[in-house]
C-alpha cells in the first residue's frame, strides 16, 4: 500500500502538525522516526490547542495509532506529560501509542550537557537545550541508553554505571551525574508509561501492519535543518528528510507521496543562514501576524519572504513530489508581497544552490506581487500559481487558518476564488 511522508521543506515551523493531523484521519498509523522534544507540533481540535513535542499527531476521534520509531531520541518525562494532557480529554488514548524498544533516550544530564556545550561555544548554535544533540552524540559514541535496556534492572545499572563513569571524568568539575538517581529516574518513568498503557514493540514486530495499512510518516523540523543537507553547523542532530522513514524499516518509492509543507513566507529559529530574512519593523509585523514564536522555546522566530531557491534545493534533496502551502492567510492585507526567485552567488545568478555552504554567500533576487486582503482573491491565486510553476511541483493543498479543517485541495480552493 502506498505511503505518505509529510516533511518540512524550510527551516521547520511550517505547520506540519496541523497538516499531519488533517491527513491522519485517512491513515491507520502515524509514524515519527526522527528528532525528539526539540520539535513542536501545534494541533487544534474542537477549538482547543494541543502542542506535541514527541507524540505523533494522530487523530483524536478515530482509532489511528502512533508509532515512535528508533530514529528518535525520547525524553520519557516529556512523553508522560503529553500523554497525561491527552488522557484528560481522551481517556485510554495512551494505548494507541507504540514505541520501538530500540529507540534511544534523552536523559536529564543530556539537557545539562546541552546547555554547558552551548555556553562554551565561541559561536553558539542556538539549540533548544532539550538535550537532543548530546543524546544523538552519545548514540553515535555507543554510550547511551535504549528503551530495551529498561526491561532488565541489573543490565540497566551496569550500562548506566559505565556511561556515568565516562561522563563524570570528561566533565569533571563542570557537571556530576549520580548513578542511583539516573537508574531510579529511568525505572520510574518506564513504569509510568507502562501503567498508561503504552505498547513497547519493534518495527520488525509490526512489519505486516506497516506494510499492509495506510501509513503516514510525520517529519520533524525541516530539510534545511537536516544534519547532512542543511545549513551546517546550524542544523539539528538527525535526518529531517523523507529518508528517515528507513528507521521504521520502510523504503519510500516513486509511487509514494512525499509531501513538502511550505509556509507562504519563511521563518527560522536560532542562528544560521537565512537569505530572505526581514528585520526591524517589517520583521515585527510579519512575526506578530504569523504568531511566530517557538512552540518549544517561546523564542521569537526570524521571519522573511518565501525563498524559491531554497525550496528548489529542498525539493531535490528529499524528492518532494507534492506541496501543501500553509499560513496563506498571514499575508492578508499586504500591499506588496515579495518572492525570492534565485540568488546571486559570487556575482553569478543561480536558480538553486548546489551545496549548503552556498547559502552563506547568497544574495536574494526578488520578484514583487500585488497583495491581497483574502486568500480567496485572484491575487493570491497568481502568487500561488507562480510559485508552483517555478518549483515544477504541484501545490496540491492550501491551508488558510490554524484549525485542522481550514485546509482545501487546490481544485476546491480554486473554485472558491472570488
From Swiss-Prot:
The active site is at 13 (proton acceptor), 41 (proton donor). It comes from the Bacteria. Binds 1 Mg(2+) ion per subunit. Substrate binds at residues 295-301. Pathway: Purine metabolism; AMP biosynthesis via de novo pathway; AMP from IMP: step 1/2. It is found in: Cytoplasm. It catalyses: IMP + L-aspartate + GTP = N(6)-(1,2-dicarboxyethyl)-AMP + GDP + phosphate + 2 H(+). It is an enzyme of class 6 (ligase). InterPro entries: Adenylosuccin_syn_GTP-bd, Adenylosuccin_syn_Lys_AS, Adenylosuccinate_synth_dom1, Adenylosuccinate_synth_dom2, Adenylosuccinate_synth_dom3, Adenylosuccinate_synthetase, P-loop_NTPase. GO terms for biological process: 'de novo' AMP biosynthetic process; IMP metabolic process. Its cofactor is Mg(2+). Belongs to the adenylosuccinate synthetase family. Homodimer. This is Adenylosuccinate synthetase. The gene is purA.
Amino acid at each position: 500500500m502506498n505511503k505518505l511522508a509529510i516533511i518540512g521543506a524550510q527551516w521547520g515551523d511550517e505547520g506540519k502538525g496541523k497538516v499531519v493531523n488533517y491527513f491522519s484521519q485517512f491513515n491507520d498509523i502515524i509514524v515519527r522516526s526522527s528528532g525528539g522534544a526539540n520539535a513542536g507540533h501545534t494541533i487544534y481540535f474542537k477549538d482547543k490547542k494541543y502542542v506535541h513535542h514527541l507524540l505523533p499527531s494522530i487523530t483524536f476521534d478515530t482509532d489511528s495509532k502512533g508509532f515512535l520509531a528508533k530514529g528518535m531520541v525520547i525524553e520519557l518525562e516529556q512523553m508522560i506529560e503529553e500523554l497525561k494532557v491527552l488522557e484528560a480529554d481522551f481517556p485510554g488514548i495512551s494505548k494507541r501509542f507504540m514505541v520501538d524498544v530500540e529507540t534511544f533516550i534523552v536523559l536529564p544530564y543530556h539537557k545539562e550537557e546541552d546547555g554547558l556545550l552551548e555556553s562554551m561555544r565561541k559561536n553558539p548554535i542556538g539549540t533548544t537545550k532539550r538535550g537532543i544533540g548530546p543524546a544523538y552524540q552519545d548514540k553515535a559514541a555507543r554510550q547511551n541508553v535504549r528503551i530495551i535496556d529498561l526491561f532488565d534492572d541489573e543490565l540497566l545499572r551496569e550500562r548506566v554505571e559505565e556511561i556515568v563513569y565516562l561522563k563524570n571524568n570528561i566533565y569533571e568539575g563542570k557537571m556530576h551525574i549520580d548513578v542511583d538517581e539516573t537508574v531510579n529516574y529511568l525505572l520510574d518513568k518506564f513504569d509510568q508509561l507502562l501503567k498508561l498503557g503504552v505498547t513497547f514493540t519493534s518495527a520488525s514486530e509490526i512489519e505486516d501492519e506497516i506494510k499492509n495499512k495506510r501509513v503516514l510518516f510525520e517529519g520533524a523540523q525541516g530539510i534545511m535543518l537536516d544534519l547532512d543537507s542543511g545549513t551546517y553547523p546550524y542544523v539539528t542532530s538527525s535526518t529531517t528528510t523523507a529518508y528517515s522513514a528507513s528507521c521504521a524499516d520502510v523504503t519510500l518509492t516513486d509511487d509514494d507521496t512525499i509531501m513538502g509543507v511550505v509556509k507562504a513566507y519563511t521563518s527560522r529559529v536560532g542562528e544560521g543562514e537565512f537569505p530572505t530574512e526581514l528585520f526591524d519593523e517589517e520583521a515585527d509585523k510579519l512575526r506578530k501576524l504569523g504568531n511566530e514564536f517557538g512552540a518549544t522555546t517561546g523564542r521569537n522566530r526570524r521571519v522573511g519572504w518565501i525563498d524559491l531557491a531554497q525550496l528548489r534545493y529542498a525539493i531535490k534533496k528529499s524528492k518532494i513530489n507534492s506541496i501543501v502551502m500553509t499560513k496563506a492567510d498571514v499575508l492578508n492585507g499586504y500591499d506588496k508581497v515579495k518572492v525570492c526567485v534565485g540568488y546571486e552567488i559570487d556575482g553569478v545568478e543561480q536558480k538553486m544552490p548546489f551545496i549548503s555552504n552556498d547559502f552563506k554567500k547568497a544574495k536574494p533576487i526578488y520578484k514583487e506581487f500585488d497583495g491581497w486582503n483574502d486568500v480567496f482573491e485572484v491575487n493570491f491565486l497568481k502568487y500561488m500559481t507562480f510559485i508552483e510553476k517555478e518549483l515544477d511541483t504541484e501545490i496540491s493543498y492550501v491551508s488558510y487558518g490554524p484549525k485542522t479543517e481550514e485546509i482545501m485541495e487546490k481544485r476546491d480552493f480554486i473554485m472558491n476564488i472570488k
